[in-house]
């Protein structure tokens, strides 16, 4: 799979627009989760999230950690509480990002989490633990469990993910917003990418443009022969072409794209880039309700031919949403690389969202094209539209 260096600190714009994703949206999600809790006979659910893997936590609360992590305590009945690894002075800001009223600061989420569960009367309960990113620091997790010796714990790491597969109208609107920001960044990057400029200068310009457009986070990989994460050591001047992978998080949701900028009159390179776009179109033609996820891979294999082995190393497709990489995945290996428990759905449904990408080499030069799509009744629809 394709990996960008993730931020230790999310330093981009952080807001919540209740008109775009209103509280009623979260209530519907909460009702569905509680229905599943009832089916599993759970009294409460503890959801962990951090700044790398926050999708399940955010799905119910709209909150995403900018540094470190936190938990949501979700009773089967009653109010949700958020316990976040932040300072008390940061609580007022955290409350602007969530509809949850009970937001608390903690520097020891495990121990304080146990106290919170006891406070709510769950010291002898059946409690589910959802930590799909497996990021809960082990010492803190062990402290929480050891402080509640009479609790019956149940792993629920994959419990919420199936509910996130099909996006609601509000989610799709948010993803189109993210796609619109990403399109502006892709278009604006053309002005920065010129022969003779140093790589780190261009990356800094792209990063600043994304932040100016309201991005919460951005992943950038670039290169002529291989994709590299940003580094001040990338002091070389770019040559006659540059491949750029971009993913932007905006209002919690991700959109992804890949572009190859050709700076010289190289007919073979231009033909290869055109071919990459044609292959993505062929793959996107498989994005129909009721279609098999595996068909995307089959078409890619047929269209890429000898380039398939190289392209598949980077990953050809995956779901996208609150996670940069989420179900459905094409195969178990792709899922395992990003820590997912399974490939997820094997059949496409309307309003699923996927990122498609093709990366291969021709005459020692990297060619990249990718886009993010919604599955609609009339076929694939790009999320990268003008705002």
List where the protein language model places each region.
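Active-site neighborhoods and metal-handling regions in enzymes and metal-associated proteins
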Residues: 1-387
């Amino acid at each position: 799979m394709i990996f960008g260096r993730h931020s230790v600190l999310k330093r981009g714009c952080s807001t919540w627009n209740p008109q775009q994703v209103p509280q009623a949206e979260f209530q519907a999600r909460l009702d569905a989760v509680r229905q599943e809790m009832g089916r599993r006979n759970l009294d409460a659910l503890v959801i962990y999230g951090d700044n790398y893997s926050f999708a399940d936590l955010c799905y119910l609360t709209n909150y995403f950690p900018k540094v470190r992590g936190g938990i949501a305590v979700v009773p089967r009945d009653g109010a949700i509480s958020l316990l976040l690894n932040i300072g008390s002075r940061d609580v007022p800001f955290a409350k602007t990002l969530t509809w949850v009223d009970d937001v608390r600061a903690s520097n020891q989420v495990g121990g304080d989490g146990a106290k919170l569960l006891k406070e709510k009367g769950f010291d002898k309960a059946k409690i589910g633990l959802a930590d799909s990113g497996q990021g809960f620091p082990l010492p803190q997790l062990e402290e929480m469990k050891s402080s509640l010796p009479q609790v019956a714990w149940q792993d629920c790491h994959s419990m919420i993910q199936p509910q996130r597969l099909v996006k609601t109208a509000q989610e799709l609107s948010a993803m189109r917003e993210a796609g619109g920001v990403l399109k502006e960044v892709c278009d604006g990057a053309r002005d920065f990418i010129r022969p003779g400029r140093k790589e780190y200068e261009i990356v800094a310009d792209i990063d600043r443009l994304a932040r100016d457009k309201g991005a919460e986070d951005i992943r950038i990989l670039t290169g002529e022969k291989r994709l590299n994460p940003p580094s001040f050591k990338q002091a070389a001047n770019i040559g006659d072409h540059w491949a750029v992978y971009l993913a932007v998080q905006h209002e919690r949701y991700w959109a992804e794209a890949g572009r190859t900028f050709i700076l010289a009159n190289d007919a073979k390179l231009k033909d290869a880039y055109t071919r990459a776009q044609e292959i993505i179109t062929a793959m996107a033609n498989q994005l129909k309700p009721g279609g098999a996820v595996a068909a995307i891979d089959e078409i890619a294999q047929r269209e890429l031919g000898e380039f398939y082995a190289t392209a598949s190393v980077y990953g050809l497709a995956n779901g996208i949403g609150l996670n940069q990489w989420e179900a459905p995945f094409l195969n178990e290996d792709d899922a395992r690389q990003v820590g997912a428990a399974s490939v997820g759905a094997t059949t496409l449904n309307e309003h699923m969202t996927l990122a498609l990408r093709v990366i291969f080499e021709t005459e020692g030069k990297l060619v990249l094209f990718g886009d993010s799509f919604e599955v609609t009744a009339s076929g694939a629809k790009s999320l990268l539209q003008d705002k």
